[in-house]
Design a protein with these regions (language model features):
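DUTPase catalytic domain/fold
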Residues: 1-210
Length: 210
């Protein structure tokens, strides 16, 4: 597999081999394209109380250790359709707190029917302690392509409290060539827009087994 250069990404966008919408040539790098952060976030309901507590400085300062213990006793269930709470990043910014998983999204629909897309965090964001995904940087061939344009869900977490802003350049997408007969992506997140919670529970049978 070979990674497309920046000029080749531009060429493939013009040819239709790569989908990036909206597209701004100023955001093309040597081998990547910068994607921006959508204002909409999701937080799992079990995790939301921790975000609220940190937002209320008095609660955080009063007994942070108790808060950490309380949250650790409310695990997410991979076999359950876990409810979420919606947040919006205002123009003035929103503080992301350690220990809270924020599901974000890119503003851009990005992908390809011909190449394998992959997202990674920008090094400038990483140097502030911001991670843009946990393990899901790889997109399958066909994800976000012309047949089913899609935004990317970002699994945002931080090492230290960080203020983030809507439409900030948060991550970058790259594209790699493939070998062999293609099997286009047709998974549960095809055509998604905005942040999407885990659909892993769909893999489990009625009794909780896979």
């Amino acid at each position: 597999m070979a990674m497309l250069t920046g000029p080749e990404i531009v060429r493939q966008v013009r040819l239709g081999g790569v989908t990036i919408d909206p597209f701004d040539p100023a955001r093309v790098g040597s081998n990547s394209y910068d994607l921006t952060l959508n204002p909409d976030l999701l937080v799992y309901a079990k995790n939301h109380a921790r975000h609220v507590a940190f937002e209320t400085s008095a609660a955080c300062d009063a007994n942070p250790n108790k808060l950490l213990r309380w949250c650790s006793n409310r695990p997410l269930d991979m076999a359950a359709d876990e409810p979420t709470v919606a947040l919006t990043i205002p123009p003035a910014g929103l503080v992301l707190w350690p220990g809270v998983l924020y599901l974000g999204a890119t503003n851009e629909r990005a992908g390809s029917d011909d190449f394998v897309p992959r997202i990674d965090g920008r090094s400038s964001a990483g140097r502030l302690g911001i991670a843009t995904h946990v393990t899901s940087g790889l997109g399958d061939q066909g994800f976000g392509g012309a047949a089913a344009p899609a935004t990317w869900t970002l699994e945002l977490f931080v090492v230290v409290p960080v203020i983030v802003y809507p439409y900030a350049r948060i991550c970058q997408v790259t594209f790699e060539t493939v070998e062999g007969e293609p099997k286009p992506y047709a998974g549960k997140y095809a055509g998604q827009t905005g942040p999407r919670a885990s659909g892993l529970w769909r893999d489990f049978g009625p009794k909780g087994g896979v």
